[in-house]
């Protein structure tokens, strides 16, 4: 177990795999071969938990043996308002998350996965070739941006306003349940796939991309 001060944001740099769970207390636990555990650093600055390999080295540079297995970092905190993954690391939240405002950023080739989110507002962005799966999101306001070749997937509930932007060759897939207004824009060869039901919908497109609304019902 690593000792850290309180935090409400998690920043993953490099290639670690982080498993997050909302809980009553703050904790950081690193599991794996000792040679790998020794190379992981976790420290808090300005309420941000930073997780990565020492001196920002990658696992390839460190020459871990094949039988060292997988390294996992388990993190808990009472609240989570921000997640940032830079590189090829993964951030996985397999349990429900309940917060006020949430910002999620993925830069690189990593993955971000949530089971379900309840919040007032969410802003999520993918830059690069990574994949973001937000699960079921109950929120009043949502903003989704994909730049590059990455993918974003979300199921929205009771959302009043949603803005979706794809620039490049990436994809955004959003399902709506009992939602208000949504605006979707594509610039490039990317795709936006919308389904479910909305009260109002608008879109704009520049390039060879596509906005698929075959399974979208506008009331």
Which stretches of residues belong to each language-model region?
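Short, surface-exposed interaction patches in beta-rich subdomains
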Residues: 132-219
């Amino acid at each position: 177990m690593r000792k850290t001060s309180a935090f409400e944001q998690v920043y993953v740099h490099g290639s670690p795999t982080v498993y997050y769970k909302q809980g009553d207390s703050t904790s950081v636990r690193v599991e794996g071969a000792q040679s790998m555990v020794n190379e992981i650093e976790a420290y808090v600055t300005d309420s941000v938990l930073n997780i990565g390999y020492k001196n920002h080295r990658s696992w390839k540079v460190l020459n871990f043996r094949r039988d060292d297995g997988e390294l996992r970092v388990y993190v808990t905190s009472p609240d989570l308002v921000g997640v940032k993954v830079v590189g090829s690391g993964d951030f996985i939240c397999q349990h429900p998350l309940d917060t006020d405002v949430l910002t999620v950023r993925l830069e690189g080739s990593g993955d971000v996965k949530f089971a379900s989110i309840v919040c007032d507002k969410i802003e999520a962005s993918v830059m690069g070739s990574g994949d973001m799966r937000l699960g079921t999101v109950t929120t009043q306001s949502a903003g989704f941006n994909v730049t590059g070749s990455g993918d974003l997937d979300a199921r929205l509930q009771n959302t009043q306003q949603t803005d979706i932007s794809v620039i490049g060759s990436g994809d955004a897939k959003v399902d709506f349940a009992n939602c208000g207004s949504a605006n979707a824009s594509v610039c490039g060869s990317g795709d936006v796939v919308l389904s479910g039901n909305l009260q109002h919908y608008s879109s704009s497109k520049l390039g060879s991309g596509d906005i698929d609304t075959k399974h979208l019902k506008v009331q």
